Regions:
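Acidic/polar, compositionally biased interaction segments
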Residues: 31-196
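Intrinsically disordered, compositionally biased repeat/linker segments
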Residues: 1-30
Length: 196
């Protein structure tokens, strides 16, 4: 857990970091990280319960340093037949410009996104920046947030599939950046702790 005091230089889960407060959220300036988000896949649907991932059966794991964060017709364990699984991505989002970002998630079925302090702890469906929960066809939900260039914001995304199609796509846009899935150079994770 981060230390919420007056110190500016700390060690955070084995990563050197500098604390900064922005828009009532805690952000971190990381000095040790790897490109991508840390992705884990679990057996079973999360049932709109963010804590599901703490005790669920892990099926695959590893960094996902792709240029975009997508799950479309993904390969899943044969025991799940690709119809009953959940995925979580952990890491940091580092904006390239200081402005208002619109973050989007399209999913089939339920998905959630937290960015800032709630991504680290205390995350619930009620405080999710994006709540696209429930069993449904492909639906897009968005949120806007003011972000500062070069600051590493904790980000957590969760997705679940419970039958039918399986789609998860993360996009972002700003007044100066057209809507895109390309997160090259914007997402990072802690290689020591596999996430934060």
């Amino acid at each position: 857990m981060p230390v919420f005091g007056n110190a500016t230089d700390i060690r955070f889960n084995g990563i050197s970091a500098t604390k900064a407060y922005l828009n009532n959220n805690v952000a971190w300036q990381l000095t040790n990280y790897s490109a991508g988000l840390y992705k884990t896949t679990y057996a079973g649907y999360h049932n709109e319960t963010p804590s599901f991932f703490a005790t669920a059966t892990l099926t695959t794991y590893g960094a996902n340093p792709a240029t975009s964060v997508q799950t479309t017709a993904i390969s899943e364990p044969s025991s799940d037949d690709g119809s009953n699984f959940s995925v979580q991505w952990l890491g940091y989002f580092k904006p390239t410009t200081t402005e208002t970002y619109t973050l989007y998630i399209s999913s089939d079925d339920g998905s959630y996104l937290w960015i800032g302090a709630n991504a680290l702890s205390g995350f619930t469906t009620a405080n999710a920046n994006i709540n696209n929960g429930g069993a449904h066809g492909s639906v897009e939900v968005s949120t806007t947030i003011s972000l500062t260039a070069g600051t590493y914001y904790p980000i957590r995304m969760q997705f679940g599939e419970i039958g039918g199609g399986d789609v998860f796509t993360f996009n972002y846009s700003t007044p100066t950046i057209s809507k895109t899935t390309n997160v090259t150079g914007l997402v990072f994770y802690n290689p020591t702790t596999n996430g934060f």
